[in-house]
Amino acid sequence: MFAEIVIAPETAQERFRQTAGMKGWKSCMMLSCRDLDILRLLRWCRMIRSKELCEAFSKDEVLNLSAAQMIRFSDAAKAWLLTPCGNRVLDSAGFVLPPATAPTYREPDITRRLRLAQIVTTAYAAGINIFLTKESELQSTPSLFLPFLHRNRGSNPWGSTRVAALLHTSDLMCAIHWVSPGIGCVALTDELTAFQNHTAAIPAKQRAMIFAASSYEEILGELDAGQEIQNTRLQSYREVYDCLKLPLLLLPCNETGCLQLRIMGVPNYRELLARIILKSHYVPPPANRAMYDALYQGVPFVMAADMDLRRIDAAVEAARSDGILQIVLAALPEQVETVLNRRYRETGKARVFTITDAALRELLGSTAPYTPPDLPFYTSEGSVLDVPPLKAP
């Protein structure tokens, strides 16, 4: 059995000792805020791989909960799941929770759940509230809602749409789709109708779509592949990319994606970051060039950290129509190395620069991902949440 040490105020320690004494326990395990977040993440996602879970939490924290039989590792899914004990602990914590469901081991369901978990854990690390149980809670920002929580037998308000999550940042309301090689096709009209209907009551400056996957390479692998569609109602994601009127952003579910989401969570992030990067060289873009973020020494400047490649392409075309052969791009290191250099620098379309850590700290305060506090968890009644230790299986 692994041990976990939580520094707690003396009053909490006394209540902890009293609980053990009254219930005849020789010892008991006091749960921390971090423990509860692990359990909640598993309740929302259903299953999470060790890779994603141990990016936000330590291996010991995960193994502690496993030893206490609140979570277990599934060999079939190759991921962590909640146990009935873990669900009971969550139910006693006072949270509003989605319904507990029995795990499914069909391969398509496992794949879908693990992809969703990558989106959720990336958003969680970006400090986004992912613990929503209804769409109306998207009124607060930043927040993320999972439509599958409302998809059950006899009720499916989202129909056959493929949206994985809804994200509300300071300026954007986004429908997130998982897009990787072989992902298939979508009925775009149905997707946009459902997106509008389910978010109409939530004010946002701009609606957008996000294509997410494990990496930029996976997303572009699908977009660059192309495929022949027999059903005229359906479109490939490449066709969606070409025809969608809304802004379309690419998001990897990794550290870069976490930082990208944090940037997108800052109100007016495009102008603010352009001003930070260019300093005294900043000149506002022309009124008829909304795809630009600034002019730098007379050259169009695009802050590309949100990975709206279509906006970059529009900026390149607009600049060339004005007789300017190259624009200037600034983005995060992975974005520059894996996408922008090949597409824009090597083709002579742009000079590409990496956004410095100093500029990011000026915008965000800190570039470190969110971590929950290492403090004891208190219920709404002010008591600590404790459970008797169980024998390790």
Give the residues covered by each predicted segment.
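Electrostatic, structured charged patches in enzyme active sites and in nucleic-acid/phosphate-binding
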Residues: 2-11, 117-393
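Accessory beta->alpha helical hairpin/"wing" motif in late/C-terminal subdomains of nucleic-acid enzymes
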Residues: 72-98
